[in-house]
């Protein structure tokens, strides 16, 4: 059995231009995002993934979590005219987060304002060009 998840990166975005900024992304999808109040979500992330995302790397890394509807048949709709994925994706950078004594998972918080949309991708790529995601 091959281990395809060696470094916790599912997708890499690269831009053109002389600086060619890159961004590594770990993807998760869930029907169980917990509303934390104060404009935040809570999500239990496996300890291994937490550790991989909080370390310093040459290419900045973020976690993108797709909130899905409870009803599986509502997740996605594909026709010749459109691809519709229900709900919203959010991003978070765990760079510099503290070590944990937890052995299985770490509950992280994600700001609801951190929607993973076109504007966010543009901003994240500009931050990656400068070398850090905040």
Per-range role (PLM):
Residues 1-7, 12-134:
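Mixed-charge (Asp/Glu-Lys/Arg
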């Amino acid at each position: 059995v091959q281990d395809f998840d060696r470094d916790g990166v599912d997708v890499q975005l690269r831009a053109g231009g002389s600086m060619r900024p890159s961004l590594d992304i770990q993807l998760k999808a869930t029907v169980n995002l917990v509303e934390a109040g104060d404009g935040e979500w809570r999500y239990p992330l496996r300890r291994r993934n937490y550790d991989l995302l909080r370390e310093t790397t040459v290419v900045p890394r973020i976690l993108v979590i797709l909130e899905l509807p409870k009803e599986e048949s509502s997740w996605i709709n594909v026709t010749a005219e459109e691809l519709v994925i229900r709900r919203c994706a959010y991003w978070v950078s765990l760079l510099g987060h503290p070590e944990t004594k937890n052995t299985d998972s770490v509950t992280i918080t994600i700001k609801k304002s951190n929607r993973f949309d076109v504007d966010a991708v543009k901003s994240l790529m500009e931050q990656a060009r400068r070398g850090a995601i905040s």
